[in-house]
Amino acid sequence: MSAFLLRKNIFTKGKGEQMKAFLILEDGTVFTGTSIGSTRDMISEIVFNTSMTGYLEVLTDPSYAGQAVVMTYPLIGNYGITPDMESLKAWPDGYIVRELSRMPSNFRCEGTIQDFLKKYDIPGIAGVDTRALTKILREKGTMNGMITTNENYDLDEVISKLKNYKVEGVVSKVTCEEKYVLEGTGKKVALLDLGAKKNIAKSLNDRGCEVTVYPADTTADEIIASNPDGIMLSNGPGDPKECTTIIEEIRKLYESDVPIFAICLGHQLMALA
């Protein structure tokens, strides 16, 4: 009985109920839930992730910069926050879950998702039917949405804001500021950081490769001048079509005889080049 009471109490805020929150889509659909993380208003592109584990890796993946992530798996946060981060911070604009575990159990746990979201000022909402939401996104396509705790929102005004919202320039926000090298004794790989998860460079380095990580605005001439054995274009956020300068540099990389391979955004940019 005491364990049940403890679980019940941690879902409340003081003596009152948890703060109500709303997720509003640009087609006018509204989901009601409870606020987790920051309580500020948030507008972003809404996307979904179907992973059953690895929610911390999702939260710290730079590919989600400029997006609010819907987790389709129904229970999130049951092992808390661990050191398994893909970058130095959290990137999504917002976080949407069905149920948030507030009693994580893990010997490596260093905190809760609730505290993690607050630390990085990320608004979130729990109590949403995330699978129904995902079906909407799947059938109607990705759309913008707002998370708000304001119960007196004007729906028409919100929809107008959502339809005019556009994500721009996110690659420049997530790339490294200057190049750095992971020493190795094997092949030399040039990694163009478009928002790379740390495990990409680590996995190459673990296999003996010397990995030089370059900022996204690095020229093809500089990369080729380093005489790499291979070039890798990383994952990253945003619309690939807006990365016109990077696409032009990739075209120049094609003119070299160096093998090129890519992940996620990098692969899309290769196709556009």
What are these regions (language model features)?
Residues A3-Q18:
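Short, Lys/Arg-enriched N-terminal segments with co-localized hydrophobic residues
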Residues E17-D221, A225-S226, P240:
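RNA-binding accessory domains that recognize and position tRNA/RNA substrates
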Residues G230, S234-A273:
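Cysteine-nucleophile active-site neighborhood
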